[in-house]
UniProtKB/Swiss-Prot annotation:
Gene for this chain: RIM101
Compositionally biased residues, Low complexity: 193-212, 416-432, 732-770
Chain segments carrying region Disordered: 1-65, 157-212, 406-440, 465-484, 522-543, 628-672, 686-850, 888-917
Residue stretches in coiled coil: 873-914
Descriptive protein name: pH-response transcription factor pacC/RIM101
């Protein structure tokens, strides 16, 4: 499609721009409307440039000029620019599908290389007169309108402010500057160039908002585009510097605020870390949310029967994670705490105008609890039903008494019937508690009188009696008091105790102290019928739902001094049956101690070495024996017949066949040598014992018997010369000679020279044996057979190794010396050393006392914390009930008032009707 040429008369007479804008870009070249307005200089320059371009690039139809193709080696001539462009794209560029794609421009003196066909086809427009978008300032033409728009920015003053070395000319035309430099907020319909105006109707799509041409356009005043010079004016620079200074000051102020916030956060983090490091039990001083969650978790576990009111290690961790609740400011002090009455107050709240005021001083001002001063009290959780409140009260009272009991066992729970859900709750025991003996004066924290003085009497789960009355017949039996409840009551919100017992048929109250040792297993099943007041049992039980919850039924005790758990079962098994005196019903308290699992007893951990009571005997196989024969050979040596091993190796020996049977027969024919014959005493070589019939079994002596004692051996040079000196040899000790003859080779050498032994003549020690006689080398089997010939006889005391004195002439003295026990043998005796009676070193008494004081102080704090929560929850409950009562009363009064007003209106209306009638 070819664009129509412009008529000459229209190109010479235009004198204004059209305000119409084409709906789409690019826009076709259309003639512009003739206007009566005078022509402007910028329009004249644009027209001149356009005329030059048209004259140079476009041939006129009248002259019939053509467009030659200047591609290298091409002589094609086109009649129009479109034909030339199609020729370049089809013939010279080609396509990849036709296998003639060329991405290098072959136009005259060009040589541009592209990577895609679209790029080179777009580049070919440069060589053809297909640029219908000229610049109104410099006359340069562009093939796309966005290229022209980008080019027009170089003719603005803002461009020269940013680019000092720019040589592009500027224009003073206000319309051009407003069209190019105006911000998007005040954008108007942009006027077109003389050759790009259109007759098409105005489109709303042309009002698209564009970003500013320069980031500093907003710093300049409106309409500031009248300067014809390239450099900005001083007023513009001053305005720009002022704006930059203001922005820099605002940025610096913002950065300063950020740095201050970072410093503050760092200080807060350091303070929080310091508080965490100073905490003794790991409780977070700033973790108020975590502490509230900890108490709510405890309350939830109590409702779900997941925890027991036992002051154990888990409960200690739970209590350490709590802080006192928010209470009124007049909570009474605890006089029974002795020296721990220096308290620290907490923030309070207003309320309870008709109740006795309470005081929040719970913890003493000690170093471990100093961080509580920086903590705000926790909010009191809301308990919705009376059953939950009764369960909470019974749990906290039982836990508080257990925590207050310093070194006593855990205070067991008892089932109570106070409140609507008390059939499976906890209740406090009577006044006969062990706290008065061991807790050091904290026993008054949870008794009935103390709770009644705080206004808690008659609350669900709290016993209403003021004290237990002791039976005159049995001092350990405690019965419920029939006295009336205290004066502090709560109206008719809660039924009486007797009515509640008759309605729920709950279990009776049982004393928790008297029968604690007789019932080691908690939570035994029991049945109750009739009136619960007529019971005489002394057992103490826990709720039945806790009997098998934790996998064992043994009582779990916590020792305050060592923080260890003591699990044990009592050896006493009882079946207690108590009969009611009123209706003859039976309250059976069965005992199932025999069903409990026995706990394995472990030895106490000590630093002493272990005592191995059971000795382990192992068979030692002789050297050179086969593995299959070691057991039998060991039994033969020790004269122990092992029938099991005989049967075990019977099959193996049968497989060995003839060789094994021959070896066994040869061993049976070999005579056995007693061991005691090898250990010869001094008397063995005396003439009196020479003819005892065992000369062939005696080992030869080291020196001949005729050598007198006390003589020295010959010198070494005589031995080296081989001479036979006639010196005398000193007789050695008999035990020494016997000890040297116990080796295997000596035992077998005794059979080589029996004649020498009989005659008493041997080769002197100084003489050299004949070289012609070879020395016999015994094999391993012979050594084994020789060792097996040894027989172990009865044990005999070892002889003394002291040599015979020269002046001892009598045989009796020699016998006395022989009968003396050897001191070295006594030292090697295997008799056990009696154990030492010295006790192990004990721990310092001062350390134990300090530890006891620390544990006692922790117990006191926890007991006070439990009491504070007990009081806070009950007062919150009472306050809520009183508010509900007051609201109900107000509603009733309002209803009565409304009813009275309605009655008055009806009466007036009736009277008016009567008067009218």
């Amino acid at each position: 499609m070819a664009y129509p040429t412009l008529p000459p008369n229209l190109l010479s007479t235009p004198n204004t721009y059209s305000d119409s804008v084409s709906p789409t870009d690019p826009e076709p070249i259309t003639p512009e409307l003739v206007s009566r307005e005078p022509e402007k200089p910028a329009q004249k320059a644009a027209k001149t440039a356009m005329n030059n371009t048209s004259t140079a690039s476009k041939p006129s139809e009248s002259k019939g000029e053509t467009l030659p193709c200047k591609w290298t080696g091409c002589s094609h001539i086109s009649d129009s620019p479109d034909e030339l462009y199609d020729h370049l794209c089809t013939v010279h560029v080609g396509r990849k599908s036709t296998n003639n794609l060329c991405l290098t421009c072959g136009w005259e003196n060009c040589g541009t290389k592209c990577v895609k066909r679209d790029h080179i086809t777009s580049h070919l427009r440069v060589h053809t007169p297909l640029k219908p978008h000229p610049c109104a300032v410099c006359g340069k033409t562009f093939k796309r309108p966005q290229d022209l728009k980008k080019h027009e920015r170089i003719h603005t003053a803002e461009h020269h402010q940013l680019h000092k070395l720019s040589k592009a000319p500027t224009t003073a035309d206000p319309e051009f500057n407003s069209r190019v430099s105006l911000s998007s907020a005040t954008r108007i319909d942009r006027p077109r160039s003389p050759l790009s105006t259109s007759l098409s109707p105005t489109s709303t799509s042309s009002h698209s908002l564009h970003s500013s041409s320069s980031p500093f356009d907003h710093l300049l005043a409106t309409g500031f585009h009248t300067d014809k010079s390239v450099s900005p004016t001083p007023s513009a620079l001053a305005l720009l510097h002022k704006k930059q200074h203001e922005e820099l000051a605002a940025y610096q102020q913002k950065e300063m605020l950020v740095l201050q916030q970072l410093a503050f956060n760092q200080q807060q983090s350091q303070a929080y870390a310091a508080r965490l490091a100073a905490e003794p039990f790991g409780t977070g001083a700033g973790a108020k949310r975590g502490q509230a969650d900890a108490f709510h978790d405890l309350l939830s576990d109590v409702k779900k029967r997941k925890v027991e009111p036992v002051y154990d290690q888990d409960m200690i961790h739970r209590l350490n994670a709590l802080v006192p609740p928010s209470l009124p400011t007049s909570f009474p002090t605890l006089p029974s705490l002795g020296g721990y009455n220096q308290y620290q107050t907490f923030p309070s709240f207003n309320g309870y105008p008709s109740l006795p005021s309470l005081h929040t001083s719970i913890y003493p001002t000690t170093a471990p609890q100093a961080q509580y001063s920086n903590q705000s009290p926790l909010p009191i959780p809301e308990i919705k039903t009376e059953a939950d409140l009764a369960m909470f009260n019974e749990f906290m009272i039982s836990l508080g008494r257990d925590a207050a009991a310093n070194k006593a066992g855990p205070h067991p729970m008892t089932q109570s019937a106070s409140g609507s859900g008390a059939s499976n709750g906890y209740s406090a025991s009577n006044s006969g508690t062990p706290l008065s003996e061991t807790s050091g004066g904290v026993e008054d924290l949870f008794n009935a009188e103390e709770l009644a003085s705080l206004g808690l009497a008659g609350m669900p789960g709290i016993s209403i009696h003021s004290g237990g009355s002791h039976n005159s017949n049995d001092e350990s039996t405690h019965s419920l008091s029939d006295a009336s409840p205290p004066a502090v009551s709560f109206g008719g919100l809660y039924p009486s105790l007797d009515a509640m017992r008759n309605r729920t048929n709950s279990a009776p109250d049982v004393s928790a102290l008297s029968g604690a040792a007789r019932r080691p297993i908690a939570g035994l099943p029991r049945t109750s019928m009739g009136n619960a007041h007529n019971t005489s049992t002394n057992q103490s039980t826990k709720p039945s739902y806790l009997s098998g919850m934790f996998g064992h039924s043994s009582s779990q005790q916590y020792d305050g001094t060592t923080h260890n758990y003591l699990h044990g079962l009592s050896n006493e098994h009882h079946n207690d049956y108590s009969h009611s005196a009123n209706n003859g019903a039976t309250n059976a308290y069965a005992s199932f101690d025999s069903l409990a699992r026995n706990k394995q007893s472990f030895p106490a951990a000590t630093l002493a070495p272990k005592m191995f009571h059971n000795k382990v005997y192992r068979d030692v196989a002789p050297l050179g024996t086969a593995v299959s024969k070691r057991a039998r050979e060991s039994a033969e040596r020790t004269n122990v017949e092992d029938s099991d091993r005989e049967e075990l190796y019977a099959d193996q020996e049968s497989n060995h066949g003839y060789a094994v049977s021959n070896e066994r027969a040869r061993e049976e024919r070999t005579p056995k040598i007693p061991v005691r014959s090898l250990i010869a005493s001094i008397r063995t070589l005396s003439p009196s014992t020479a003819a005892d019939g065992e000369d062939d079994l005696k080992l030869p002596a080291i020196s001949p018997s005729h050598v007198e004692p006390g003589t020295d051996l010959p010198p070494l040079y005589s031995i080296q010369r081989g001479g036979h000196s006639s010196g005398q040899y000193r007789r050695a000790s008999s035990l020494s000679s016997n000890s040297t003859s116990t080796s295997g080779s000596s035992s077998f050498n005794s059979s080589l020279a029996p004649s020498n032994v009989a005659s008493g003549t041997t080769t002197p020690r100084g003489s050299t044996p004949p070289r012609g006689v070879p020395t016999k080398r015994h094999t391993e089997d012979e050594i084994v057979r020789g060792v097996k010939r040894l027989e172990l006889g009865p044990a005999e005391p070892l002889r003394s190794t002291t040599p015979e004195l020269p002046d001892s002439g009598t045989t009796e003295q020699a016998l006395e010396r022989d009968q003396k026990p050897d001191i070295s043998a006594l030292s090697l005796s295997s008799s056990p050393t009696p154990p030492s009676n010295n006790p192990p070193p004990s721990v310092s008494t001062a350390n134990e006392e300090g530890k006891d004081m620390t544990i006692e102080e922790m117990r006191r704090r926890h007991a006070a914390l439990i009491k504070s929560w007990l009081v806070a929850v009950n007062l919150q409950w009472r306050r809520k009930k009183m508010e509900e009562m007051q609201r109900q009363q107000r509603e009733e009064m309002e209803e009565l008032e409304e009813g009275g007003e309605a009655m008055n209106v009806d009466e007036r209306e009736r009277e008016r009707v009567e008067v009218v009638a």
